Amino acid sequence: MRRSFARIACVLALCAFIEVLPASLRGAALEKINASYGAISGSMLPIWVTKEAKLFEKQGLELNLVYISGGPRAIMSLIGGSVQFVNHSGMPALEAYQRGADTALIASPMNQLEHSLVVQKNISSVEQLRGKILGMSTAGSLTDILLREGLRLNGIAEKDVTILPVGDLGARLSALQTGRLHGVIVAGVQTLTATKMGFKQLIDFSKLPIEISGSGILVRRAYVMRNQETTLKFLKAWIEGIYLVKTKPEFSLGVLRKYGATQDVEVLNSIYGHYKDKLDTKPIPLGRVAKSMFYLLSRTNPEIPSGNPEGFVDARFINQLESAGFFDEMNRQYGK
């Protein structure tokens, strides 16, 4: 009889042990989800690192990660249901929210501008931009909105320049090299790439009085409310990816080399150092940042419906993780 009880106790202990193992180690089927990222930029390093380190699998998720250039296209994919999570600037999703969509910002590790206007080396002042042709990614994108506002804050009206949608960073720099454009807007350490090519930084957007969510996690409320556990698993994986970026430089640089469209060691090290220092390991989305983004949208798009931009922010999932001790666990594992 005692042997039977001992056997039962062993089986129960084994079951309990298996239950606390990550899904990837239990042999459980992984839940398939789709996510997109919106830039070939160091701001996307956390989701790239999370993917390459198999942290999504650790949480029981099989992530199909795709690149979608341009905020409006990414948000159309989100609303249409082809992706469940979007890692992108919050601006296009906020505009969709103000127009009645159920989009929300649930995490944001960076809330400052990191863009620059780089120009041909014969342009030495903002005044010389009058009559020039400038490039951004796509109409209505973050680069479009910021370029127009940056010009306005520096005393240049939109009517005084021509602004063209050109495409991703490679297309913009190529157009600058051929002389088709006189200036383009770039982000983060892309400025270093441009200056190494002989171009000049004319406007540093980080000095403007504006906050934005530059690389947040965007969702549809209908999806996350139906799939709260999946959402928490996604955030756990992605946030651990932020910790990994900050503590594992060699691995992170290898990932950056794979995704970042450059093999230049100086550029890679500069990108890594820049984002390692700026990423917040507790990425709480903030209402004041939503208000700042709405201000930007309304400056360039006056007919956008007014309302409550703070309602775009949903911090419940980050707050749940904090209450459950997740951040304490990460700090113990990786060091605060």
Identify the function of each model-found stretch:
Residues S298-K336:
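Conserved C-terminal helix/tail region of periplasmic/extracytoplasmic solute-binding proteins
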Residues A28-T178, H182-G188, Q201-F205, I210-E211:
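Short, glycine-/small- and polar/acidic-enriched structural segments
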Residues M1-V11:
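Bacterial N-terminal signal peptides that target proteins for export
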Residues L21-A29:
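Sec/Tat signal peptide C-region and signal peptidase I cleavage site
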Residues M91-P92, G170-A261:
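Pocket-lining segment of extracytoplasmic ligand-binding domains
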